[in-house]
Every structure is written in C-alpha cells, then in structure tokens.
Amino acid sequence: FVFGRGAQECEALVAAGVNFCIVPGITAGIGGLAYAGIPVTSRDTNAAVTFITGHTVSGDVPAALDWDCLSKGSPVLVIYMGSRHLVRISKRLMEAGRPSSEPVALISKATTPHQKTVTTNLGDCVAHMKEYDLKPPMLIIVGPTVAYHKKFSGKDQ
C-alpha cells in the first residue's frame, strides 16, 4: 500500500472479523509513469527514487519532510496527491537547491483512459498545471527521467 488507506481498511476488516484477500497491484507512481513513457529509474540518470505524499490526513504538506535532504539526496522525486500544494512544493524544492529548470512531469488521472501528461520545469509547473487544467488525482515527477517522456511516448498532451 502506498500513501492510501489500505492498512486502515485491513485493520477495520480484521477488527470486524471479516475475511478478506489482498490483491496486489502496481502503484500509480510506477504504472502512471510507465503509461506516460517515463522510467522511474534509468542507468543513465538515477540510481534512486523517492516517493513522497503531497499531503497528510489533515490536508497539509507533511511537516516532517526534510526538503534539503530530498532536494540533494534523490535525483527523482515522485510526489503523490500534491496538486493542491504544488506552489508550496515547487517553492520548497527550489529553495532547497533544485534549479527552476529541473524537468517536471504532471500526470493527471494516471493509468486511466483520461490520463493527461504535461512536461514542464520546476519554475513553470504551477502555471502549466493551470494552463492545461490538470485535475487530481495527480502525480508530480521531478528529475531527469522526465526527459524520456517525449522520446518514449511520442507525445505531450
């Protein structure tokens, strides 16, 4: 389970004595990127990736995130559910040292027939989210693997 309610739902089922079966799947942070022609890792660009939630249960950006560590320690960031806080997230990453020219992909409605992928950069991502009217759920991908989108998918929507 990645940043969802799966664990809490399983706990409720166990507490209620309900038998259930977990069916494994592929998280949007992998499947959505693949569908957009963006590898999560590539031997030529990164040996690490960090998955981050864009908001907590209360709806705020997680206070415990170490933006300096994230900015310097992970070449590729995959941010789930961050559209509402994209202004703050992009600002914090740039303040922590990521350049405004850093490649960014915004993937709306990942792995559905309505998936829409827009590539941009960290400095312009908020404007592009509004310009292309991208709606949640949305993934925000920051890093060099974003450059593969046009090459592997053959399009930018």
Outline where the language-model segments fall.
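Short glycine-cluster motifs
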Residues: 1-56
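A contiguous loop/helix-start segment that scaffolds small-molecule binding in enzyme catalytic cores
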Residues: 5-12, 46-48, 52-157
